[in-house]
A protein has these predicted regions:
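Conserved functional hotspot residues or short segments at active or partner-binding sites
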Residues: 345-554
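Polar, glycine-rich mid-to-C-terminal structural blocks
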Residues: 292, 304, 311, 315-376, ...
Length: 554
């Protein structure tokens, strides 16, 4: 009895944390044993022979999927995908391909500048017939992309059919290591002497590319700078810190990482003298601005070094590291949260890992208040909230269908390919526009093609009719429903006229890309960009710019 009492007292004296660790380790060991035994039984007794790579790989991926979208297992065959994500580089030919619904075939959509595809002479619309003798008819874009990639220095034969002539053309192309997208696909001086830099991602040497662009434009006398981080999904924290370092003094904390293990804790501090601490700066952001882009915009906001303009960012405030696995696999693992200089964690979603898993969106009502260097107040509401909110124009439904984002008769693609074939040259990227005659020709082709699309208003009306029937009001309101239905019927010609400005600019951007590549397309798009226009307006109003960066009087 005394021995039992002593054991109970000893157990009671054990630190709670130690007991929890012991229970946790026991649960881990038990579940690993169960998993191991289950697979042994499957391998030994299941009616069919199993592919261990597929079955175990699916089990691992399902387990990680229950945690968060960023913790991912890469088998040996998938490691190149991870490497491309980190470096921005891959070995291939450098072009965007897309699925043509009409031809049921992959086609060239956009060769990238200074890559093997552009140097070989491939054009938008070229139909990919075969790769090294293997027919590509009916093969999806993933399959075709995998065959376009390979080892650096390897040569292959590509056969395409050019729509303008109907003839097949053979190309011998040598693969090489190239950037998936340039870090800075476009920069240039805009109206009023304002510099503009489009930053597509934070990959190797992104900071150097931004520095080169900025220094060149500053030599030409710019009076302000716009850095465009819209649709920038992030990348390297170090590259983000290095870009911030261009505009803030040495020795400033840009971002701090905190995790379960000490090895996950890391602070990024500006380590060099800046190149400019006074140039007025506007950073453009939107809902697809994420991760390292939010580190950069959050730091500049906390230092009151620039004005953030656009819409609230994505809210990815967690970071990952990569770990080597047996047999040349790798694990990208979420290990920490990161915090802006003022201490904000901008993670928008909390991932729950118990009771089946769920996600919780951060609530504005429970958010804490943080202060910038000048004393401006911001809350950790999830994402970076812009200093000035400016919403971009939304894409109308008809434009979405014309762009072949869903099943399409390819009338837009065919028009663009024909236009390019008829015009060996066009006006400079920043000046090119379709004439009213050109747009009318496009409109007539759409009408003649039998183009159809779903209008959201018709969908909502159908849903409302079903609800009215369910609640017993439909018969009473039948005539009103029928009248509204007649008014909402498809009128493609009317919709093409009503949305002419948006559709026309969409076509212009596509056509310009065929002549001046991605940088030309971006330059062309800036003419009709509401958020860029607001940024230019702000940078030409010094008093308002300074006022925004001062704290509000209470």
């Amino acid at each position: 009895m005394k021995k039992l009492l002593f054991c109970l007292l000893l157990l009671g004296a054990m630190p709670v944390g130690a007991q929890e660790d012991k229970d946790h380790n026991l649960n881990v060991a038990k579940n690993l044993d169960v998993m191991n035994v289950i697979y042994k039984y499957l391998d030994m007794m299941y009616v069919d022979t199993l592919d261990a790579n597929e079955v175990v790989g699916n089990a691992i991926r399902s387990m990680l999927k229950s945690l968060d979208p960023y913790t991912v297992y890469y088998s040996e065959s998938d490691v190149n995908e991870l490497r491309t994500m980190i470096t921005g580089k891959y070995v291939g030919v450098g072009m965007l391909i897309r699925w043509n619904f009409q031809l049921r075939n992959a086609v060239v959509d956009e060769p990238y500048e200074n890559t093997p595809s552009a140097e070989a002479g491939l054009k938008k619309g070229d139909v990919i017939v075969s790769i090294d003798g293997e027919p590509m008819k009916g093969k999806d874009t993933k399959y075709v992309s995998e065959r376009l990639r390979g080892d650096a220095g390897s040569t292959f034969e590509l056969v395409v059919r050019r729509p303008s002539t109907g003839k097949q053309m053979k190309f011998k192309i040598t693969r090489r290591s190239i950037y998936q997208t340039p870090a800075v696909p476009y920069y240039g001086i805009q109206e009023g002497g304002i510099g503009y830099i489009n930053l597509s991602g934070f990959v190797e040497n992104s900071a150097k590319a931004v520095r080169r662009a900025y220094v060149e434009m500053r030599r030409k006398g710019i009076r302000g700078l716009i850095v465009d981080l819209r649709n920038n999904g992030g990348g390297s924290e170090q590259e983000a810190a290095d870009i911030v370092n261009m505009f803030v003094p040495k020795g400033r904390l840009v971002v701090s990482n905190r995790g379960k293990l000490k090895r996950a804790n890391h602070d990024y501090i500006t380590g060099m003298e800046p190149i400019d601490t006074v140039m007025p700066l506007v950073v453009l952001v939107n809902g697809n601005t994420a991760s390292a882009s939010e580190i950069m915009s959050g730091a500049l906001q906390d230092f009151d070094r620039g004005v953030i303009l656009g819409t609230r960012t994505y809210g990815k405030g967690i970071a990952q590291m990569t770990l080597d696995l047996p047999y040349n696999g790798q694990l990208k693992l979420t290990t920490n949260k990161w915090y802006t200089p003022s201490g904000r964690c901008i993670q928008a979603i909390t991932y729950k890992h118990a009771r089946g898993g769920s996600t919780v969106q951060k609530s504005d009502s429970t958010a804490k208040v943080f202060l910038t260097a000048h004393g401006r107040e911001f809350k950790d509401v999830g994402g970076i909230v812009p200093d000035i909110e400016v919403k971009a124009d939304s894409l109308p439904n008809i434009a979405y269908y014309l762009a072949a984002a869903v099943d399409s008769n390819e009338v837009l693609h065919n028009y663009e390919v024909d236009y390019i074939a008829r015009h060996p040259t066009i006006a400079p990227a920043g000046e090119f526009s379709l004439s009213d005659t050109d747009y009318e020709e496009f409109k007539q082709r759409v009408m003649a093609s039998g183009f159809k699309y779903d209008r959201e208003s018709e969908k909502y009306l159908e849903n409302l009719k079903e609800l009215a029937k369910f609640e017993g009001y439909y018969d009473e309101a039948r005539s009103e429903f029928e009248a509204l239905e007649n008014k909402l019927k498809h009128n493609v010609a009317k919709d093409l006229d009503y949305n002419k400005r948006v559709i026309k600019h969409m076509i212009e951007n596509d056509i310009v890309a065929a002549y001046y590549y991605q940088k030309g397309s971006i330059e062309n798009s800036l003419r009709d960009d509401k958020q860029v226009a607001e940024a230019l307006k702000l940078l030409n109003d010094e008093a308002k710019y300074r006022e925004i960066l001062r704290p509000k009087k209470k």
